[in-house]
């Protein structure tokens, strides 16, 4: 059995960085009040809570459902940020564990001086509105696949009490900040990619016909958790044969047949940041001639798009680099999705308008899908955009035909 890889050095985002982010938002707000909600949770029943990514980005707090941070650039120095937490509830704490009293240790850990319980929200907002009647909407009211933002209820309540308030669209403030990753954020995503690499290498050593798609998924996700991840950053896709032509296939229960190609789209989460990796591998350990032909075409497209990445370019230009190659080969209609997306606290991270900036982290994922031949191919890497190119965070995960077959031969 191969030796266990050495433990990875664990990065983190310092408290001071969260404070800098809040300062940047305060600067963008000018004389407007901003609210960011953590979101609600049924964690008492399901044991899982993930805050709204805007809230996590500004605070680093991941275990306080219902929390709100109020940002007021018009407040006296040291009081511009107010964090409001749910009241203590002994009955809930019997089930979920004790929560900390508000005091100096908690304030220092969060790096926020003004921390109160949610019952004080009305007092805090009333104080803010004595200085300004301008209120910022920092994130959209809702999306088709999500509940309506709690902002809407807050805005309605404020408008009922203060008929002269002005609510302004400031959704670009946090979006533009999140689109450019700091060195600490890049380190977090790199770590998620490194954990993914360990898991993918182990998976490649174990895959064989007769296993199921579920077995492949379990091998990957066990590899994530045993190397410091809390699990996958999104639902793992393992599509064998015809299933590999379904972009968001998640049943993951079919058996692996000898001649199947398997499209595997999965990435580890670390500290809220996720990797997003896709590899396509042969169940038998060796590509057929036809599988190799299509695979090499997609790989060539991936390399062309990767070469096109640099600060100032657009996703359209990156997409064109792949699409030209695939279309020229006669498979343009079999590449029916975009080339990639931003990556960060969300797997499809927030995407502001305009060209890419240095520090953005994006995916590149061309594909060709041939349901009439019972297979598809997609290959995906994660890269950091630099001034004159990019840094590939997932280059260590086998990608060439030779590298994949070599890794699978070690089983």
Residue ranges and their predicted role:
Residues 1-411:
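Active-site neighborhoods and metal-handling regions in enzymes and metal-associated proteins
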């Amino acid at each position: 059995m191969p030796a266990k890889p050495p433990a990875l050095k664990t990065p983190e985002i310092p408290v001071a960085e969260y404070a800098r982010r809040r300062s940047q938002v305060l600067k963008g707000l000018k004389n407007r009040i901003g609210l960011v909600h953590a979101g609600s949770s049924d964690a008492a029943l399901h044991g899982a809570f993930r805050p709204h990514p805007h809230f996590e980005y500004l605070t680093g707090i991941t275990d306080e459902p219902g929390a709100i941070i109020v940002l007021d650039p018009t407040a006296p120095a040291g009081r511009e940020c107010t964090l409001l937490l749910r009241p203590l509830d002994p009955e809930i704490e019997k089930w979920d564990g004790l929560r900390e009293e508000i005091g100096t240790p908690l304030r220092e850990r969060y790096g926020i001086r003004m921390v109160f319980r949610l019952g004080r929200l009305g007092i805090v907002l009333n104080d803010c509105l004595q200085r300004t009647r301008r209120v910022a909407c920092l994130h959209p009211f809702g999306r088709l696949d999500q509940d309506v933002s709690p902002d809407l209820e807050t805005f309605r309540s404020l408008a009922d009490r203060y008929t002269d308030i002005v609510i302004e669209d400031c959704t670009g403030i946090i979006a533009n900040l999140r689109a450019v990753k700091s060195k600490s954020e890049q380190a977090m995503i790199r770590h998620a990619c490194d954990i993914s690499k360990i898991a993918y290498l182990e998976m490649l050593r174990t895959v064989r016909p007769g296993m199921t798609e579920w077995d492949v998924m379990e091998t990957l996700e066990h590899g994530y958790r045993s190397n410091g991840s809390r699990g996958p950053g999104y639902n793992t896709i393992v599509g064998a044969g015809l299933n590999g032509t379904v972009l968001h296939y998640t049943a993951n229960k079919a058996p692996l047949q000898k001649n199947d190609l398997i499209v595997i789209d999965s990435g580890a989460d670390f500290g809220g940041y996720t990797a997003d990796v896709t590899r396509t591998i042969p169940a038998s350990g060796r590509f057929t001639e036809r599988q190799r032909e299509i695979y090499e075409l997609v790989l060539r497209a991936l390399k062309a798009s990767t070469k096109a990445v640099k600060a100032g370019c657009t996703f359209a230009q990156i997409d064109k680099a792949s699409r030209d190659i695939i279309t020229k080969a006669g498979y343009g209609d079999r590449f029916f999705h975009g080339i990639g997306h931003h990556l960060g606290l969300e797997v499809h991270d927030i995407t502001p308008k305009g060209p890419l900036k240095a520090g953005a982290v994006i995916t590149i994922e061309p594909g060709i899908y041939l349901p009439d031949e019972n297979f598809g191919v997609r290959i995906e890497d994660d890269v950091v955009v630099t001034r004159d190119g990019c840094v590939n965070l997932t280059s260590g995960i086998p990608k060439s035909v030779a590298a994949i077959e070599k890794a699978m031969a070690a089983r």
